[in-house]
Amino acid sequence: MRRFEFELARMSGAAFCVVTGYRLLTSKWLADRVEDYRQRVIADRKQILRDAAVIRTSIQKQMELVRISVRKGHSHQEAATERNSATDTMIGVVEKCGYEPYIISPSPREKEYHGSRQFYSLADFRQDYRRDEITDRHVIVMTDVDYYVDMHELVGLGVPILLYTFQPSTVSGEVKDGYFTITDDHVHYRVAGGKDVRHRIWNYNQDTMFVRSKPRGFWASLKQILRDITGITALCGYLYLKLGIAPFGDQVTLFTVDQFKMGEHRNIVSIVPFATCRSNLLKISEYGAELDYMRYQQRNNNANFNAVTYISQEGPLISLGLEGNFASVQLPLQDFENIRTAYELSKNNNLSDTVRRSARSCKEAAIIHKCLQAGCDLASEVVHKPGELARHYQALGDTYDIDPSEQGKCYAREYAPGPLTQTAVFPSESRSNELATIDGRIAGPQAKAKSREHITPKMHKVARDFVRHLVPTAGLGRPYPLTYVEEHQTKPLQRARNDANRYHDEFTMIVKAFQKKEAYNAPNYPRNISTVPHTQNVKLSSYTYAFKEAVLQHVPWYMPTHTPAEIAEAVQSLAASSTELVETDYSKFDGTFLRFMRENVEFAIYKRWVHLDHLTELSTLLGNELQAPAVTRLGIKYDPDCSRLSGSALTTDGNSIANAFVSYLAGRQAGMDDDEAWTWIGIVYGDDGLRSGNVSDALLSKTASSLGFDLKIVNRAPRGSPVTFLSRVYLDPWSSPASVQSPLRTLLKLHTTCDTQSDIEDVGWAKTQAYLVTDCLTPFIGHWCRAYQRNCTARVVQYADYNDIPFWVKNEDHVGNSWPQSDSVDWNDVVANELGLTTAELLKHLAALDAYTGPVSGLPRLTTSLDLEPKMPVALDGEVQAGPSQQPQTDKDGTSPTGDRSAPRRARTALQDADGRACRSRRSDRSPGKRDANVRDKRQRRSTTPPRSRPSVPGPSSSGRRTDGDRVRGGAARQRQRRRSPV
């Protein structure tokens, strides 16, 4: 009995254990534990691909169509145009994102880029085999190639892909210069001129997909073979089937898909891999769709139909057609389902019934009826409507209305009476002036710039050449530490901001603008200062400082960071290589920047330079500079669009780059090659430019205008004539580096200051002392400053303590290497000409200044009657006297003049003799010790002394000497001749 009880107990215990074990194995608790383990294993084994989200967003933002035309008479001109446009569009997107294109099956036009050329068709035999290494700097670009490559292997590389491909939304139809049909899920594509291809279509109609990749490399392949032979692969497959998780497995690459419409049935597809994992770790097919080919065929016993559903703006549309037939029909999916339901419910179905139900023509209804008779299940693939290509935005101009009763805040002060009876004016701080600032400096220039802009395909190519020329090797740049930036920002306000924001990393990108406090020759739209968040500026400065020292200061045309002496040397060096020099003046430069210049040139340069480790951060910082919300000090909101934010770390260098690019592009438009155009850029400092005269004025202006800028040619100076750069006049840069500060602009404002805090006498001493450093030998300026200091109490000043002093004395290196000067009597002629006087009148006044002793308030003033034309209607107010108020004149095209230089520039072009030839300057025609009253101005002066005749400058046709323009034209002609010569 006891034995029986023991056996019973043992059997009961075993049964209990079995039942308990079974319940545990099938319990939700164990399932949760297994799933949790699986998730942890996946988290440990998956790999996130770097910068995927940023790359995808950048591609979406930068996708902008570039139109490329082909020659007339091309056998399939429209198709080739769209194809070439797509290729240039994709290349442009890649380079604007800071990456380099890797082109699979490039055409001869793309031979300069890295890529792979293999043989997929007969046309490929025109080129040689090549296979460059793919790096993490590349984005793969394909044009009508994805049909022939293993997309699973390509996506598995983990490199972003841009491809132009055929994505039909119907089962047959017309395409540009041809038509297509579908048989056995293969598209048969026929184009005029003989192109006839068959291939399958990849299904990109999911936003997130995956691919499986086979092992790559010798050892990985060998390991896989050994696992297959030993049965490990089969065992892992069994475990995966039973448990949903197993060792090993193929690599799975997950990626996002975006599509952009190029034309009918034609899309640009963006593929950005973002993670990898192993297939045996999860039931991957339950997570999403695997990249596969499109399936159009609907098999049945009667006839093989093709079907595809297209999601349009009006709703889903289904396309039906017999395999291989050109005839097809497309109708709303809902209508087709209703027709099919009616067909199935009706006992007798005739073609006439389908015609009536579908409300289609007999021809289209016949296709629908045939499909219904075949009894197709119609499990059609779905094709999604792609996104449209990005477009430019148009800025809306703000209107402003000056309130006569408004009393603006005055800030400018005089520390002495003006050297001239005419003085500069200052805009008061008021709401009406802020509205005028937005209209005249931002919204208006942006609207006019967009109306002028005309970007051609060649300009995209030239922009890429310029970027690569400035940054030959990509990905070498790294930012400086933020501590480096703080050490170089030594102004009191900068130090205070650094201290306050040192522990704050996050910020909201809002532009806070204010009206700049500065003097104008005549009433003008006040300049706008757009400040950006401190963190944005400091972080971006860490890149701009590094880029400036690594790249910019080593190129010959870049003048910032150079001392005045070095700049003067550069002007003289440029003159030595030129027979003519051209001065350029941009109007409202900051307000006329458009997206092409910012993204295709400026941003592309920084992105190409920076290392991939920092590309994401830099791209974000650069993106913040465009279309940021902005508000003025008095609360007026506005849209800066793509204009330059003047308080940004990019301002000086970005403006210099843009200025240089305009000069470079003009050279390319004139027929120069890359190196030649680069050599003839000239010199630039922000919006100030000076270049050789080998490009015509019309071409320079037209080139700038096509980019949106408003460029005026101020002076085309032949050898021996005065030239102005950075508001300094060089009497003859071909023979001397000496220069003087622009007399008119300086003398109108010399006696004023915008400093509202410092002692007025301290400011006066500091300002005059600063001008005596840079222009002690300049007639009138030097005389006036010495007269002021002679008649007031001497002071010891530190230039760093004052803001309203010349820029060129704020740096000790600049002071030690100041502008070269000379005591030539010819400078009297220059100053007199600038002020509209005779030399005798000027010398008389200078003698009065030298002899004056008395209170500063009694300093002699020179009477002038210059035409200082207002640029806007104003109510004159403030302590500083202003010019008259009048309506702005209009140009020939009816637009208001927009130049910032209010005073007329006198005789910046060469004088002419009776035959209309350019004449040399005074010094070569004058006897020693004699002065010429007519220095640069050909107009009649108040002096009764008649002008002396001058020998003409020999033109190209009258001597053996050729101008720079002749050399360029000759070089271009020789180049064309070489191209025409047989090899």
Curated annotation (Swiss-Prot):
Enzyme class: transferase
Biased composition regions of type Low complexity, renumbered to the chain: 943-960
Record-level GO BP terms: DNA-templated transcription; viral RNA genome replication
RdRp catalytic domain: residues covered: 579-701
Domain of life: Viruses
E.C. numbers: 2.7.7.48
Chain intervals with Basic and acidic residues compositional bias: 914-937
Alphabetized GO MF terms: nucleotide binding; RNA binding; RNA-directed RNA polymerase activity
Pfam families cross-referenced by the UniProt entry: Noda_Vmethyltr (PF19222), RdRP_1 (PF00680)
Signal peptide: none
Annotated region described as Disordered, given as residue ranges: 879-983
Compositional bias annotation for Polar residues: 883-899
Catalytic activity field: RNA(n) + a ribonucleoside 5'-triphosphate = RNA(n+1) + diphosphate
Keywords: Nucleotide-binding, Nucleotidyltransferase, RNA-directed RNA polymerase, Transferase, Viral RNA replication
Protein family according to the UniProt entry: Belongs to the nodaviridae RNA polymerase family.
Function: RNA-dependent RNA polymerase which replicates the viral genome composed of 2 RNA segments, RNA1 and RNA2.
Protein name (database record): RNA-directed RNA polymerase
Record organism: Striped jack nervous necrosis virus (SjNNV)
